[in-house]
C-alpha cells in the first residue's frame, strides 16, 4: 500500500519532508474549503519545491460542481503548478454520465500538458448525504473517462468515517471493481490506524490520511508531525506483512 499524506500548507509540507522516508505521496489540499478543497497554485509550487524530488505531489481540484469546462481548466492549473497526481472530487455530479463528462475533460486537459499525469476520480462514501454518484459507480466512471485511479473519501467531516458509510466488505467490492478496470483503488475518510488491517485485507492500493497523523487526531486544528507519520507507516507496513504471510499460508 502507498501512503498519501495531506499537508495544508508549506510549513506542514516541510514536516512531511522530514518524514519523507515514511510516505509515498504528498497531497496538497485546503481542508477549510472542504474534503477535497483546492489550495492556491503558488502553494502547490512551494510544496513541490519543499519535498524531495522523488516524492510525487498530488493536488486536489476541489469538491467540484458539474461544470466540465471549469473543472478541466482548474485541473490544468494544478498540473501546471507542479502536481503529478490530480484528484477531482465529483461532488456536484448527480449521475455517472455527468461524472464521466467532467473526468474526460480533466483527463484531456492534464494529459495534453503532461502525459505522465495521474488522474484520480474521487467520490464520497457518504454520497447519500449530498446527492452525488453512488460510491460503487466510481471505478466504472474512472475507466470510461480514461482516469488512472478511483478513490473514496468522506464529504462531510463530522466525526463519521469511511467505514461508517461504506463497510469493509463494500469497500472490498470497490477495490475489486477498480482492479478489474485496471485502476488503482484509493481509500480515505478519517482513516485511523485501527482501520489498516481491513485496508490491507481488501488490497487497497493507496491510503490517504491527514487527521491520523496530526496532533490530537484533528485534521483542522492539529498539525502534521513527522513522528506520527512514521508511526502510522510502521503500523501500515506491519498489517501488509501480516496479510501477505496469511495469504501465502492459505
Swiss-Prot record:
InterPro entries: 4HFCP_synth, RibuloseP-bd_barrel. The active site is at residues 29, 87. It is an enzyme of class 4 (lyase). Keywords: Lyase, Schiff base. It catalyses: 2 D-glyceraldehyde 3-phosphate = 4-(hydroxymethyl)-2-furancarboxaldehyde phosphate + phosphate + 2 H2O. GO terms for molecular function: lyase activity. Its EC number is 4.2.3.153. Belongs to the MfnB family. Catalyzes the formation of 4-(hydroxymethyl)-2-furancarboxaldehyde phosphate (4-HFC-P) from two molecules of glyceraldehyde-3-P (GA-3-P). This is Putative (5-formylfuran-3-yl)methyl phosphate synthase.
